[in-house]
Amino acid sequence: MIPQRILMKFFDFHIQGRDHDSSLRLLLEASRLGYQGGVLVYPSERYPDLKSDLESLRENPELQDFEIARGVMINASDPRDMRRSVNKFRKKADVIYVSGGNLKVNRAACESRRVDVLSAPYTSRRDPGINHVLAREAARNNVAVELPLADVIGSWLKVRARVLEQFREILKLHRKFGFPLLLTSRASSIYDLRTPGDIMNLAECFGMESSEAEESLTSTPASILEDSGNRHLLIAEGVRLLPES
């Protein structure tokens, strides 16, 4: 698991890794832009690559002051598939992401205490992908909702307007129910990365206050990383497995 040094300021909580060299370029650029850490996210089927790449990256002297967490993205076809994958990777990854869009999967993710992040629940939808019921469950289970700004930066006209409106609706639910909210780059190349200041300015386009945007880049990521090590012990509300002595 990640080193116990989570006293960072800005964290890009979703950097898409493909291989060692491209991941290195992304992490170095994120550091240059003012981040003190990032989550390197690989698809679940490529976890062995993530494990080997991360070991090498953490030993790179240019990244010694940059915290790197290990994230796994689960693309599930149904809730059963999601739960099976979450159980498989919960002890292996620092952060478990569930790719959103399918309403049943969105709900299962919000109801699971073993999921860290529901990513882009609005994907391929005209609605935000979560409602009052799911927002309440996400808050109860401390499941964060990710708003990747790549969906705004990489879209045009009507699509961009729709995504911004979906962000606004999710922000309203966040303010009402209090589930964790993340702003990320979801960068797959160095040209997708933005400075923390740029991200906070962009967040104003869908009504985020500067304090809310800063929290989504700082204290919320730190809290998720701090809690993730105990997620595998949570099996039901109020029920926690005791670690072996």
UniProtKB/Swiss-Prot annotation:
Compartments where found: Cytoplasm
Gene Ontology terms for molecular function: ribonuclease P activity; RNA binding
Gene Ontology biological-process annotations: tRNA 5'-leader removal
GO cellular component term of the entry, any: cytoplasm
Function: Part of ribonuclease P, a protein complex that generates mature tRNA molecules by cleaving their 5'-ends.
Quaternary structure and partners: Consists of a catalytic RNA component and at least 4-5 protein subunits.
Protein name: Ribonuclease P protein component 3
Organism, as annotated: Methanothermobacter thermautotrophicus (strain ATCC 29096 / DSM 1053 / JCM 10044 / NBRC 100330 / Delta H)
Organism placement in taxonomy: Archaea, Methanobacteriati, Methanobacteriota, Methanomada group, Methanobacteria
